[in-house]
Amino acid sequence: MPIDQEKLAKLQKMSAGNKVGGTRRKQAKKTGSGSAGNKDDTKLHNQLAKLHAVTIDNVAEANFFKDDGKVLHFNKVGVQVAPQHNTSVFYGMAQEKNLQELFPGIISQLGGEAIQALSQLAAQMEKAQANENAGEAKDEAIPELVEGQSFDAEVE
């Protein structure tokens, strides 16, 4: 069946103003604004209330010493304790730091084992500095090679 191009153009021109179907507005996407985190906190607070946890005020900082020598440091910390259930909760943003970063204020918090580890750490640091100084002395005697430059003229 042949199609008359003039009639087709005329029909397209007439139907250009007619819209088929209704207007659709875009659905607004829901953004996750941390509601899942709030639910977890609410559940945690409810459980602590069941345990009759007591909030401890005026805690400046908390440090958890790890076996690998690093420290979990809580600068601004909230603490709740339920001693009858052997439960303690620490709230805050933890930062993983090296032991050296927290000196000298952390010395009073260290136990006997940590003080031994501290003396070993000091010995390791002294050895590392001695090795660096020895390495620098060796490097001064070795000239740097530059492409296109010869050292024969300097020797004579």
Curated annotation (Swiss-Prot):
Location of region: Disordered: 1-42, 129-156
One GO MF term: unfolded protein binding
Domain NAC-A/B residue range list: 38-103
Tagged with keyword Protein transport: yes
Localization, UniProt: Cytoplasm; Nucleus
Any single GO BP term: mitophagy
InterPro entries named among the record's database cross-references: BTF3, NAC_A/B_dom_sf, Nas_poly-pep-assoc_cplx_dom
The keyword Transcription is annotated on this UniProt entry: yes
Pfam families per record: NAC
Keywords of the record: Cytoplasm, Nucleus, Protein transport, Repressor, Transcription, Transcription regulation, Transport
Gene Ontology CC terms: nascent polypeptide-associated complex; nucleus
Assembly and oligomerization: Part of the nascent polypeptide-associated complex (NAC), consisting of EGD2 and EGD1. NAC associates with ribosomes via EGD1.
UniProt function note: Component of the nascent polypeptide-associated complex (NAC), a dynamic component of the ribosomal exit tunnel, protecting the emerging polypeptides from interaction with other cytoplasmic proteins to ensure appropriate nascent protein targeting. The NAC complex also promotes mitochondrial protein import by enhancing productive ribosome interactions with the outer mitochondrial membrane and blocks the inappropriate interaction of ribosomes translating non-secretory nascent polypeptides with translocation sites in the membrane of the endoplasmic reticulum.
Family note: Belongs to the NAC-beta family.
Protein name from the UniProt record: Nascent polypeptide-associated complex subunit beta
Organism field: Candida glabrata (strain ATCC 2001 / BCRC 20586 / JCM 3761 / NBRC 0622 / NRRL Y-65 / CBS 138) (Yeast)
Name of encoding gene: EGD1
